[in-house]
Amino acid sequence: MWIGVISLFPEMFKAITEFGVTGRAVKHNLLKVECWNPRNFTFDKHKTVDDRPYGGGPGMLMMVQPLRDAIHTAKAAAGEGAKVIYLSPQGRKLDQDGVTELAQNQKLILVCGRYEGIDERLIQTEIDEEWSIGDYVLTGGELPAMTLIDAVARFIPGVLGKQASAEEDSFADGLLDCPHYTRPEVLEGLTVPPVLMSGHHEEIRKWRLKQSLQRTWFRRPELLEGLALTDEQRKLLKEAQAEHNS
C-alpha cells in the first residue's frame, strides 16, 4: 500500500515509518509512506504557508498555492487511482467500517491541515473525501492522519503476524473485544478465568464471544442496534444479560 502525506511537519510521521507494526511494514516494503511539505513549494524567503481569511476573523488559513502545488506533486507521484483525503473535524467520522473501506485502496493521499484549515475551493477541487477521527478539534491533521494510517495498515496482508489478529480486534465484527489475560495466573488476588486454561478450544471460543457481547451491551449498547446477530450470539447475549441482572 502507498500513502502520500501533505504536512507542514513531515518529521512527525517517523512515529509511523520507524516504529512498531507500521515501521516493520515499511521496512518489509508492505507499506510505503511519502511526505511533501508545502513549505518546499513556496517562493518567498520566509517560506510563508499561511494567509489571512477573507471576511476577517481570528486565525489564519493555509496558503493556497504551496498547498495546491504539494497536492499536485503527490498526485503525480501516485499516478492514477489515488484517493485524496482531507483530515477535518467536518468529515465523516472514522470507524471500523470506514477503516475497512479505506483499506481497499492501494493508494491514498492524506492532506493535513493546520491553522484554521484550508480554502473551501481546494476541498471542492482537490479533495475526494473528508474524514474525522472524532468530535473534537486538534491543532493539525497529522495525528488523525497517523491514526488512519495505523488503522488501515493492519489490513495489509503480511503486516500482522496473524491476519486473525485484525479480524478479531474490537469492532472487526461490530462488537467490542473480549478480555485478555497473560501470566501470572494470579495478579493482585485476581485469577485467570479457568476456561482459558482448559485447552477446550470450542468452550474458549464461546466464552470469548459471550464476553464480547456482554462488554458491548454494557459499554456500547448502541453498537448492537445495527447488528444482525446470529442465533448463537442472541443466545449468549441473553445468558450474559441474565447473569448480569441476577
UniProtKB/Swiss-Prot annotation:
Keyword Aminoacyl-tRNA synthetase appears in the UniProt entry: no
EC number: 2.1.1.228
Protein name from the UniProt record: tRNA (guanine-N(1)-)-methyltransferase
Function: Specifically methylates guanosine-37 in various tRNAs.
Major subcellular site: cytoplasm
Gene name per UniProt: trmD
Amino acids binding S-adenosyl-L-methionine: 113, 133-138
InterPro entries in the cross-refs: Alpha/beta_knot_MTases (IPR029028), tRNA_m1G_MeTrfase_C_sf (IPR023148), tRNA_m1G_MeTrfase_TrmD (IPR002649), tRNA_m1G_MTases_N (IPR029026), tRNA_MeTrfase_TRMD/TRM10 (IPR016009)
